[in-house]
């Protein structure tokens, strides 16, 4: 996320420093966004408006504890969907959140203008600053609480991470028979469009919703015969859940 955020922000904002545990990574990104890489928090320029922490959730507490020693008066925000504002605010007075609800892969560019951005802060003036900053990137900016943001993060795991794993399983099935996975692309895109334009429950189709036991059993047998007990287990669980949801 740090790479994408820095590149997006540099077009309208000056980025002063980049820090990473790996100085080489910091230097590479700093070169891209015309900033100065540093190898220690004490080297960070204290005369800045904002510091962003874009690290793993478990690293946030230790990072903010170290940062506040050198930047006691600077607004510091994290970019996590699942970490409460209090993780920062209990350690630093001027704390905030700047969370983009998006999936990031280094090799893919992001359409920031349509990416929802969620901001939160301990002080109203800082909240407005974050709102203004977010609006420089996206048309969809929201002031959400930590609890609301966490619910979105949980929902995103279902909508993004789990669905992508389903695509992975689908590819494994067709790869085993030398069938081109791209043949499923129109189906995948139509499913996503229907789910975003309608109530997903009302758009459910398939043998589990119809409770077509002949098809369900045939698919299960195919997976068992292919020695894919792992896929058979997922198929059975999801079919059961869909059937119960529509019974």
Regions found by a protein language model. Name each.
Residues 1-40:
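NAD(P)+-binding Rossmann beta1-loop-alpha1 motif at the extreme N-terminus of oxidoreductases
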Residues 3, 7-11, 31, 65, ...:
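Short, well-ordered alpha-helices that flank and scaffold nucleotide-derived cofactor binding pockets
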Residues 19, 38, 52, 77, ...:
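Hydrophobic/aromatic beta-strand patches that form the interior of the parallel beta-sheet core
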Residues 21-25, 80-84, 124:
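Short, polar loop motifs at secondary-structure junctions
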Residues 25, 29-32, 109-155, 159-196:
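Internal alpha-helical scaffold of NAD(P)-dependent oxidoreductase catalytic cores
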Residues 44-45, 49-112:
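Glycine/small-residue-rich loop that forms an oxyanion/phosphate-binding "nest" at active or ligand-binding sites
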Residues 182-247:
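NAD(P)-dependent Rossmann-like dehydrogenase/reductase catalytic/cofactor-binding core
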């Amino acid at each position: 996320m740090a790479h994408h955020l820095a590149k997006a922000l540099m077009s309208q904002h000056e980025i002063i420093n980049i820090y990473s545990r790996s100085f080489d990574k910091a230097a590479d990104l700093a070169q891209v966004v015309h900033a100065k890489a540093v190898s220690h928090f004490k080297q960070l320029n204290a005369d800045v408006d904002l510091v962003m922490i874009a690290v793993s959730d478990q690293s946030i507490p230790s990072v903010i504890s170290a940062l506040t020693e050198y930047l006691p008066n600077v607004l510091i925000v994290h970019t996590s969907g699942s970490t409460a504002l209090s993780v920062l605010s209990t350690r630093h007075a001027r704390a905030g959140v700047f969370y983009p609800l998006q999936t990031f892969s280094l090799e893919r560019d992001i359409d920031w203008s349509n990416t929802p951005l969620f901001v939160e802060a301990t002080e109203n003036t800082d909240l407005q600053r974050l709102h203004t900053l977010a609006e420089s990137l996206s048309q969809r900016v929201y002031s959400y609480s930590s609890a609301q943001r966490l619910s979105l993060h949980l929902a995103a795991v279902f909508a993004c991470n789990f669905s992508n794993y389903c695509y992975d399983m689908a590819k494994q099935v067709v790869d085993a028979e030398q069938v081109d996975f791209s043949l499923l692309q129109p189906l995948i895109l139509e499913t996503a469009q229907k789910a975003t334009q309608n109530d997903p429950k009302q758009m459910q189709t398939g043998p589990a919703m119809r409770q077509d036991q002949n098809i369900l059993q045939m698919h299960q047998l195919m997976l068992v015969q292919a020695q894919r007990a792992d896929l058979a287990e997922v198929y059975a669980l999801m079919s059961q859940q869909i059937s119960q949801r529509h019974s």
